[in-house]
Curated annotation (Swiss-Prot):
It is proposed that R and S are tail completion proteins that are essential for stable head joining. It comes from Escherichia phage P2. The lineage of its organism: Viruses, Duplodnaviria, Heunggongvirae, Uroviricota, Caudoviricetes. InterPro entries: Phage_tail_completion_R. This is Tail completion protein R. To phage T4 tail protein GP15.
Length: 155
């Protein structure tokens, strides 16, 4: 699976506290299933819920959400373009620990395609990333909340 590590990198690049405190970020794959058909190849699609848990977070909630949205735009765009994706594709809940910190659990309904081809009697497996986003899509490198620069990252 490519997407869990990709999202982890996106979050640690965008949220400084997660880069300096990687134990605050936990990622789990739940409710996985495989979709396959009786087509000529054994290609299939992995479907799963990716749970992203950030513990003891003291920053602004949007500092976590905006990088996830930017990542989804390129890695699971149907969450933003389909009714089902908009309703159930990106959900969260938070546990308020005290006046200054909270734990947040973000759930993302993701898919990943895997191509399986047969060449000279051998099976070859390749994980396929999402097609590139339509142009022009800007890729911001800074995040401002209430007019204050709270994060900068490199592509």
């Amino acid at each position: 699976m490519l997407k869990p590590d990709s999202l982890r990198r996106a979050l640690t690049d965008a949220v400084t506290v997660l880069k300096t405190n990687p134990d605050m970020l936990r990622i789990f794959v739940d409710n996985g299933s495989i979709a396959s058909t009786l087509a000529a190849s054994l290609s299939f699609e992995k479907r799963y819920t990716l749970n992203v848990i950030v513990t003891d977070f003291t920053g602004d909630f949007d500092l976590l959400i905006v990088p996830v949205l930017a990542w989804l735009r390129e890695n699971q765009p149907d969450i933003m373009t389909t009714d089902e994706g908009q309703k159930k594709g990106f959900t969260f809940y938070a546990d308020i620990n005290n006046d200054s910190s909270f734990d947040i659990s973000i759930s993302l309904m993701l898919t990943e395609r895997t191509l399986v081809s047969e060449v000279d009697g051998a099976l070859h497996v390749k994980n396929i990333s999402e097609p590139p986003p339509p142009e022009p899509v800007t890729r911001p490198m800074e995040l401002y909340i209430n007019g204050e620069l709270v994060s900068k990252w490199d592509e």
